[in-house]
Amino acid sequence: MKRKKKQWTKFRHRVIRNLAYAVLYPYTRIKYGARIEKFREKQKRQYLIAFNHQTAADQFIVGSAFKGAVYYVASEDILTNGFISRLLSWAVAPIPIKKQATDVSAVLNCKRVAKEGGTIALAPEGNRTYSGKTGYIKPAIVAFVRTLKLPLLLYRIEGGYGVQPRWSDEVRKGKLRGYVSRVVEPSEYQQMTDEQLLALIQKELYVDESQSIETFTGKNLAQYLERALYVCPKCGLTTLKSAGDEIACSCGETVRYLPNGKLQGENFPFSTVAEWYDYQCDFINGLDLNSLPNAPLYTDCGLRISSVQPYKRKTHLDMDGRAELYKDKIVLTIAGETTELTFETIDVATVLGRNKLNLYHQGKVYQIKGDKRFNALKYVNLCYRYKNAGKEGEDGKFLGL
């Protein structure tokens, strides 16, 4: 006889949400300057909430706009931290998913929550923006929406990147706004083609912070921008270093980050991080990998390398490891031994948080964390540039996030 599955949605989740709201709503207003517009609807029903991903507090912002519990689709990494993860699962029951991978179990769990009457929320980008522009949204979101058959609620967050860019540890003073952009009923999206529904989601969730006229004041405005950038418009692949409000390249190029989000430098070709980031993506997509030397393009030392057991735990393998990035592989040195991960055999490479690197390789998951200045993005971008060889269209330009 089959054992009956435990219910995913619990009454305690609503109680905990209400208690947390009393603390987190004023917290987000004070810390992030958030103006959260409450969603008021007479009908009490469940939704699939899709939001653009700008800050580490997006789930608090979204949750503050709605009554009742919201079940978030979140990175599996949040369930690998022992007691804290178990407490989180008990309190709010997030739905874990493998980043940038097809995760059937996550879809099944979402169907289960929907069947139980729960509201589900996710960021279709799958990653928090590094540039201030809404990132690539995979077409698979359309099939996901159609599978759940819930009213689709599109939620926009504006100003979050200005308040705290993904690459920064500092929170700046400015204005953040969260609001419902549109509600799409199942009867409406059932009449749309897949292309039309995808275009609608992309349009309603698209935000470009580089076009903002707001100012965001604070200390060390450019600090750790090198987590997001590793290509110099003058010398190409490079290592950048930030200090205070400035970021500099080893070639001597120096740029200042201003409170309005603009860049200031002598004859510097980009006025915003978004322009520089787009140039970096174009540069990588235009690289002729065959012309690159068979030597490390980058070497990072002093890395904490862990083995991750998805949804369960992580085990530290080396607190002083090394990673070498080649044109076609990543070589890890763990406890004195080398492990070669070719781009062909890496299933998924992704960035977690500000600068953690996860590599899914032949049934194993390696997590790599460096110092404050570590750039995980370059490993992901080069890996996908290799994998995209021969592909056309937007999929051929997708660099992992």
What are the roles of these predicted feature ranges?
Residues 88, 194-209, 375-390:
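Short amphipathic C-terminal alpha-helix that caps PH/PH-like domains
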Residues 183-184, 195-228:
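A conserved mid-domain beta-alpha-beta active-site/ligand-binding segment of alpha/beta enzyme cores
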Residues 247, 303-305, 328-333, 355-361:
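Short polybasic amphipathic segments
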Residues 344-401:
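Acidic, Ser/Thr- and proline-rich intrinsically disordered linker/docking segments
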Residues 265-322:
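Anionic N-terminal interaction surfaces
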